[in-house]
């Protein structure tokens, strides 16, 4: 029988470069997925808030008729949007941490939880609430009280 042994020389520097390229590609893909998810989530929040404004038109009209300022109504709806997205962000961080620990326990892979990243995630969700809550809040603040009360 022919028993030949073959050897393959590998340059560790080239392997490290390939691993770095793969890591960079993966990070880029994850950033795109996260960005698209945030955009879709933000649009969802905006739609929910627009529906809320529509359903509460008479309430807004009544508040304006008894003297509520535009700024107060704008801040009310903006606060609701920020609370909604903050709770979503907090729930997402908690779910992510729990999932990381479950996967870690199954694969015996250590988990490192970044408090800074968790805080950034919740703050970013608040920013999404502000950005995507502006249009519905502005719409609510600028409703004409007479038209709003007439719709009831």
Name the predicted role of every residue range.
Residues 1-30:
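Mechanotransmission and gating elements of multispan inner-membrane complexes involved in transport
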Residues 28-104, 108, 112-132, 136:
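Transmembrane alpha-helical interface segments in multi-pass membrane proteins
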Residues 20, 58, 150:
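A short local structural element in Rossmann-fold oxidoreductases
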Residues 137-152:
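Short cytosolic juxtamembrane segments of multi-pass membrane proteins
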Residues 17, 46, 147:
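Glycine-centered loop/turn positions within well-structured domains
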């Amino acid at each position: 029988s022919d028993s030949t042994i073959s050897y393959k020389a590998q340059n560790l520097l080239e392997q490290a470069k390939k691993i770095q390229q793969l890591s960079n590609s993966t990070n880029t893909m994850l950033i795109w997925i996260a960005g698209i998810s945030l955009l879709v989530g933000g649009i969802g929040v905006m739609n929910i808030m627009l529906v809320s404004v529509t359903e509460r038109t008479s309430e807004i009209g009544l508040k304006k008729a008894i003297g509520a300022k535009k700024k107060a109504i704008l801040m009310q709806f903006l606060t609701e949007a920020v609370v909604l997205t903050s709770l979503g962000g907090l729930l997402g961080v908690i779910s992510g941490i729990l999932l990381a620990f479950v996967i870690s326990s199954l694969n015996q892979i250590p988990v490192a939880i970044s408090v800074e990243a968790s805080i950034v995630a919740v703050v970013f969700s608040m920013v999404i609430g502000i950005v995507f809550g502006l249009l519905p809040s502005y719409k609510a603040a600028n409703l004409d009280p007479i038209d709003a009360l007439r719709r009831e």
